[in-house]
């Protein structure tokens, strides 16, 4: 009789455990990162009796997470790529929207400026036309500055976003390390049974971390996660979390980059080319490949325009017969010394000598002990710099003066057009200073009137001259910039959408294994309810039989 009661009680306990698990699944249906659980029932060991081995009911051997590591890793990899592409696309679309806005187009301002110049060429002696040209010039400069400032602000926002990403990475790493410790201790207390809720929390944190920076997960004995970034740097080792830091770049102090915090060596800068995954990788890639290229192309255009216009303007004569002066001011090249250089006092200075040869790129300049190796950051082309008779380096329309004392492996970052627009202004403020004439009326041998417009015509002809990079007109250069940005944005949008669809498909696969299906849980609820009632009926039968025995007299 006791065996029958024990069997019924084991069944009731098993049914109760299974119902609790089903209930827990339903409760957590909308919880992000929850993994469906299943109660595992097993047959209890039988007992040898008079008639042979007799069963002893059922017992709960554990509660299993329905987890597929292979699909989960595939999903993480896809999410990592998707996050990087989406971040890069979102940033790039901001530039695309800026350049595509016809109401504030630089192309329109250029056209207005040359249209005003055409009017002045037709009426060289007209003070109103002269004043109108100055107004259009100021409007053009303002448009250059507005566009450039937007890109500078975006650069600052990238710096802020990098700092925010690093803070999130550190926070996630600490939480994962803490969960590693808790899971290890609770698994020991539970005689090997894992705390499923903590496993879910840890996996969810790993997924969120992976969206920011790609991580590789290796599992130690006992289920502890060790995390390394895709570049090989350890982020979590058991219950210890390594830290990252957002620091000024050693190459460019205006830029924030990522460093690995080492207790002995301090902050060790991580090469940005190794951080190319997740939203952080998307930010860094956008900055180095997209934002820099756009800013440099815009700066190259401004430099070529201002320098060409100045060169021609100084060849002419103004309304008072004086030699023409520079019409525009323009910013000079910037050179940053790497903070890791052996001699911090060594510096380089650069000057534009031929604006038509200046390229839309920055340059990394490294001393190899004998020569100076130059790398164009736009295409990673490396060459040995040539020197002029004075020992100055000649680089794409620039001359670079090198200070004494440079040591092997000292490096510098040359930014030819970084500040071109910042310091761009209209220098001619008096309409009489516009040099429209090709000869001075002060010269007694020259018989020219106020209508002399030959230098003005030469200025107007610059509109169709290939002065940007030596192969493009002003309008062509800007149109190419707008087109390149638009094409790149479109490509990123397509890639981002495609990768997002891959994530959706893998997520569906993952959820088919680990997700909670309410219809399935409702079915399990009914099944275990019947199972419970059946065992209750067995117990009721055993009680009835026991009562019958007690009533025998």
Swiss-Prot record:
GO molecular function, one term: structural molecule activity
Matches recorded under InterPro entries: Flag_bb_rod_N, Flagellar_basal_body_rod_CS, Flg_bb/hook_C_dom, FlgK, FlgK_D2-like, FlgK_helical
GO BP annotation list: bacterial-type flagellum assembly
Compartments in which it is found: Secreted; Bacterial flagellum
GO cellular component terms, semicolon-separated: bacterial-type flagellum hook; extracellular region
Keywords, sorted A to Z: Bacterial flagellum, Secreted
Entries under Pfam families matching the protein: Flg_bb_rod, Flg_bbr_C, flgK_1st_1, FlgK_D1
Stored NCBIfam families: flgK_ends
Family statement drawn from the similarity comment of this UniProt entry: Belongs to the flagella basal body rod proteins family.
UniProt protein name: Flagellar hook-associated protein 1
Native organism: Salmonella typhimurium (strain LT2 / SGSC1412 / ATCC 700720)
Gene name per UniProt: flgK
